[in-house]
Amino acid sequence: MAGLYLLGGRQRKLLLKGEEEWNLYEAALILHLDTGSGKVRTCVEYKSPLEARASENSSMVFKSGTLVGNTLYACTSTELMIFKLPEFERVGYISLPCFNDVHHVTPTCDGNFLVASTGLDMVFKFDGAGKVLNEWSVLEEEPWSRFSRTVDYRKVESTKPHTSHPNFVFELEDEVWVTRFRQRDAICLNKPGKKIDIRVERPHDGLVCGERIYFTTVDGRIVVADRGTRRVSAVFDLKEMSDPNSLLGWCRGLLPVDERRIWVGFTRVRKTQFKENVLWIRSVFRDGMASKPTHIALYDIAERRCLRECNLEAHGINIIFGIFPDSLS
């Protein structure tokens, strides 16, 4: 079985009581996991420069990215980075004032980039020089109606609570799509009116794979939509395939191995002050439940069972956003 690249971050060792999410993580990490031997090595440990973060204590985490061939497009909350694998040579870097709580970046079919700037409830398209080519609000409002073009939002620690919280942007032919956490759907931005209704829970990640579009929901489900019909065709509840006495965690990051096996990432649940982020926990938590550590798990969705797990906290990752294949291993 091939190796995996894991994107996330390491939590600070000394935390103040009530520390907010945007101050929790001291370094963005990319690890390589040999799924055969279980060996883990660090490929990238990164801290954003001061000009690209709000304060010295701002969290630094690699969020969700995109792997095309041997090129990895990764992002922090305020930056896009391009790496050539397997050496992880950094060959590109863009940071723009409109980047706030960026959750996902992907290259476009015309050679540009799309970013979900989650903190602004917007999606931006820009070229390799950082010139913004298009911008969309993910809500029924004009872009910038709630924010200012003159503010450098890299210097704003947080804009929470978010009205929508877009987190995964993707293309289907000539259409630009994005998932919306609060609205439980994915919508087409450049052809308004088209929508994939995710409904069962709030989505937080996705992947277009052949004729299937996979989405994770925060409570631990995989939602599969048909690329042709843009309709949900299957829902797999990973909680039903796992230890019923354990709280799986925030479900973010997925990688199909084949039509039946899929890797999924889970981040340990921690307390948060934002009501919208704990509703799903209240719906599944029962007395006696233990919160599982940050981990990845391999599921057989055909037999509906968990095949194996890997604890990531032992290797320094406390939050995980992305899982990508090492095609050379």
Question: Locations of the language-model features?
Answer:
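Short, conserved, GDST-rich strand-edge loop motifs in beta-rich repeat architectures
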Residues: 6-25, 59-62, 149, 154-168, ...
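Conserved beta-strand positions in repeat-built beta-propeller and related beta-rich domains
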Residues: 6-25, 73-77, 115-119, 164, ...
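Beta-propeller blade signature
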Residues: 22-36, 129-130, 278-304
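Short loop/turn segments that connect beta-strands within beta-propeller blades
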Residues: 35-37, 84-88, 127-131, 189-193, ...
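Surface-exposed loop and turn segments in beta-propeller and other repeat-based domains
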Residues: 40-58, 94-98, 133-162, 233-247, ...
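Blade-loop segments of beta-propeller domains
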Residues: 41-106, 313-314
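Residue-level detector of Asp-centered blade-edge/turn motifs that repeat once per structural unit
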Residues: 66-69, 107-111, 171-173, 208-211, ...
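Loop/turn-rich, solvent-exposed surfaces of beta-rich toroidal or solenoidal domains
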Residues: 205-297
